[in-house]
């Protein structure tokens, strides 16, 4: 075969490679006696030897076509291409027949044979590429022009030939999907090729990049004329119509070849010429499913608007619900708070956000105009039924922020009084320089918080392990002077459910006075100790042995203590005070008061102090004598003065006043020395609280306990009263009985015993 050329054609690299891998063609070329062997042998150095024009042999043409086809496949491995591709022509030649040189007069028949040539990959690995960029450009332009001219002349009559299919499809069809050992026929590619041929346009140029050659891709790019650029675009569109998967496979199968593309078009597996004068829309491939250039700007605009809308809405003081309500009244489209929230968070679809944006923008402009314009005319128009702006007129109430120091002061006030009056709230507000309404709301919220933290239970002190709730409407003791002189006495007998010892049973202690009618209200016990409960059946002041009880027992290395508590409903309460009956039987109180965490031998001390509502850690042990106990009672009054002559009873050895804050005088003692009445109802103070009784030389036996009765009148407040009772009988089993009666008519009896080792 012979190809016309108007320039020098460097061919040694291709020809030598073809001979190396195709011995038959090498022998054919050597047997041809046309005198071209000198050209072939002298073509080693392109700088010194020139190839004569029109002296290309069939082997050279085959190698050239094979090389071009390798370029069109865009980077298939050269070694694999050499093994899988071949150039076959339609010439009927014998194996041993020499190939004659094709003369210029035989060019029409050669051109007729070129379109029928099935282009397979020919030649082996191409080595020794020493072409200059100018020589490469001339070579490729010449070969492409000749092949295209032959294809244009014979495309009309041979549309279904394999050559046309190969020329059009080899540029974009990967080897992984269409085997090149068979003719390739693609109808769509043929139509595109026919259009290109009718317009006499150049096909896209493809350049091979050798894996071993580290040359920049720019040296292989051939500049084109404006006519060729249009053909390049159409050929590029032809590539994009092939399946996308095939191109992906092509990329995966060709990792060793790097090819470039023009910046305006998506990356291809081929090198394309930059086209700068053409608009982007023409170079954008049709197959790529990317959004248009306007859509990203719309997304950014929507995102920016959503952010701005939220900021301006908050600045104007509207909630998301207000916006949805106002838009429904203004524009007839009701939107929920969730919709507005999703719009601000960009959680809606692009289409819905585009629909919602103009409405929100209009509402925002109207809201800002209303805020800035204070004229009554505009307000009346917007507030008309047709322009309902109730949603716009609603403003979010500013959240009140209270400083730390003010909050601490309010907490102190709350501890003193949880329900202050209006005058007290006004005073607190003036002191803290706060609004009265803010203070009132704070106290209301604080009371609700207190209910959540400490829900109302069945009464009693939170520090006590035993809580009791009692109710009765009958008075316990008459608040008259006949309390002491009355000859009628009722005996309250307490028998423990679990007897401590045979000699420790407490039989009775007298309470002189008058009582009212009986009540059958039953005590309710909430206890952390294991309860032993039963129903109270006795309607009198003498509870049955099966009364509601709770027992706790603690043992240490030095002694064993048992506390037994019974709760008994009393039929006659005092006005608002408490009644406590106490006796001896307590030892090592100083050890007990050192801390609530440890349980000493006199475990009854902690139980009695808790039953009295007092924390044992309030006073230091150094203030008490050995074996002392501390109890607390609310101040109160009986309303009448008792005889001071009873103070000279022999059962009292020492009375000491250790506190000066407030007073709760001991106004009377009964003749037996078992009952002490405390009164703060306007009588002269005899002693101030707390009281310390030091009965070391007294007859405070287990069956005859000393007692303290404290009664408080309604509305009377005062300091805490303390009773300090000591005993020296530490070597015998002691029993102590406590009875605490509140104004509601309930009595809690605590029986404790401690045994010293």
Curated annotation (Swiss-Prot):
Pfam families, per database record: Homeodomain, Pou, POU2F1_C
First-listed, main subcellular location of the protein, grouped into a coarse class: cytoplasm
Compositional bias (Polar residues): 19-43, 275-285
GO cellular component: cytoplasm; nucleus; transcription regulator complex
Keyword Nucleus tagged: yes
Keywords: Activator, Cytoplasm, Developmental protein, DNA-binding, Homeobox, Nucleus, Transcription, Transcription regulation
Function (record text): Transcription factor that binds to the octamer motif (5'-ATTTGCAT-3') and activates the promoters of the genes for some small nuclear RNAs (snRNA) and histone H2B. Acts downstream of Notch signaling during radial glia formation. Regulates apoptosis, possibly via an FGF-signaling pathway.
Domain-related comment: The POU domain controls nuclear translocation.
Protein name: POU domain, class 2, transcription factor 1
């Amino acid at each position: 075969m012979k190809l016309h050329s108007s320039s020098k054609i460097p061919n040694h690299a291709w020809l030598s490679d073809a001979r190396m891998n195709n011995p038959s063609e090498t022998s054919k070329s050597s047997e041809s006696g046309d005198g071209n062997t000198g050209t072939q042998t002298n073509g080693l150095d392109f700088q010194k030897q020139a190839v004569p024009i029109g002296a290309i042999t069939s082997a050279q043409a085959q190698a050239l076509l094979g090389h071009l086809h390798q370029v069109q496949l865009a980077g298939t491995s050269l070694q694999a291409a050499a093994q899988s591709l071949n150039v076959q022509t339609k010439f009927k030649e014998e194996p041993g027949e020499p190939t004659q040189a094709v003369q210029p007069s035989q060019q029409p028949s050669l051109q007729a044979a070129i379109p029928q040539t099935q282009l397979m990959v020919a030649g082996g690995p191409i080595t020794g590429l020493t072409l200059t960029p100018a020589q490469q450009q001339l070579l490729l332009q010449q070969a492409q022009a000749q092949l295209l001219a032959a294809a244009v002349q014979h495309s009309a009559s041979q549309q279904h030939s394999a050559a046309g299919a190969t020329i059009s499809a080899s540029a974009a069809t990967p080897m992984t999907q269409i085997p090149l050992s068979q003719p390739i026929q693609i109808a769509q590619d043929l139509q595109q090729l026919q259009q290109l041929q009718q317009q006499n346009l150049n096909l896209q140029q493809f350049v091979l990049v050798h894996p071993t050659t580290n040359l920049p891709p720019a040296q292989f790019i051939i500049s084109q004329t404006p006519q060729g650029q249009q053909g390049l675009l159409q050929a590029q569109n032809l590539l994009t119509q092939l399946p996308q998967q095939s191109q992906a496979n092509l990329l995966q199968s060709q990792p060793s070849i790097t090819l470039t593309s023009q910046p305006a078009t998506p990356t291809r597996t081929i090198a394309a010429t930059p086209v700068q004068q053409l608009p982007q829309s023409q170079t954008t491939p049709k197959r790529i499913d990317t959004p248009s250039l306007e859509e990203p700007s719309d997304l950014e605009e929507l995102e920016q608007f959503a952010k701005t809308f939220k900021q301006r809405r908050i600045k104007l003081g509207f909630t998301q619900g207000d916006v949805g309500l106002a838009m429904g009244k203004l524009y007839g489209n009701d939107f929920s708070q969730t919709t507005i929230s999703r719009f601000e968070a960009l959680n809606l679809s692009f289409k819905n956000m585009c629909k919602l944006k103009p409405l929100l923008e209009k509402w925002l402009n109207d809201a800002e105009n209303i805020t800035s314009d204070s004229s009554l005319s505009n307000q009346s128009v917007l507030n008309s039924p047709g322009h309902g702006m109730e949603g716009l007129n609603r403003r979010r109430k500013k959240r009140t922020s209270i400083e730390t120091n003010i909050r601490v002061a309010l907490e102190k006030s709350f501890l003193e009084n949880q329900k202050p009056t209006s005058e007290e709230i006004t005073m607190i507000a003036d002191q803290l320089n706060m609004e009265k309404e803010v203070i009132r709301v704070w106290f209301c919220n604080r009371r609700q918080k207190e209910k959540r933290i400490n829900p109302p239970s069945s009464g009693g002190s939170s520090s006590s392990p035993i809580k009791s709730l009692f109710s009765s409407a009958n008075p316990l003791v008459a608040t008259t002077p006949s309390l002491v002189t009355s000859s009628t006495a009722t005996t309250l007998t307490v028998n423990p459910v679990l007897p401590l010892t045979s000699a420790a049973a407490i039989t009775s202690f007298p309470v002189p006075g008058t009582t009212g009618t009986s009540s059958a209200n039953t005590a309710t016990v909430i206890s952390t100790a294991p309860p032993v409960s039963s129903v109270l059946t006795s309607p009198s002041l003498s509870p049955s042995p099966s009364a509601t009880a709770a027992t706790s027992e603690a043992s240490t290395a030095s002694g064993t203590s048992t506390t037994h508590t019974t709760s008994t409903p009393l039929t006659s309460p005092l006005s608002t005070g408490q009644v406590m009956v106490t006796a001896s039987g307590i030892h090592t109180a100083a050890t007990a008061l050192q801390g609530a965490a440890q349980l000493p031998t006199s475990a009854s001390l902690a139980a009695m102090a808790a039953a009295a509502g007092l924390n044992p850690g309030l006073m230091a042990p150094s203030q008490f004598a050995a074996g002392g106990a501390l109890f607390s009672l609310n101040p109160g009054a009986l309303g009448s003065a008792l005889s001071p002559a009873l103070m000279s009873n022999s059962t009292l050895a020492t009375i000491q006043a250790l506190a000066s804050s407030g007073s709760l005088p001991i106004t009377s003692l009964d003749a037996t020395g078992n009952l002490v009445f405390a009164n703060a109802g306007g009588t002269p103070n005899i002693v101030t609280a707390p009281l310390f009784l030091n009965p070391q030389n007294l007859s405070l036996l287990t069956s005859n306990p000393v007692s303290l009765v404290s009664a408080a009148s309604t509305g009377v407040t005062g300091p805490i009263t303390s009773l300090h009772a000591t005993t020296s009988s530490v070597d015998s089993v002691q029993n102590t009985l406590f009875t605490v009666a509140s104004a509601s008519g309930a009595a809690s009896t605590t029986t404790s015993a401690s045994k010293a080792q």
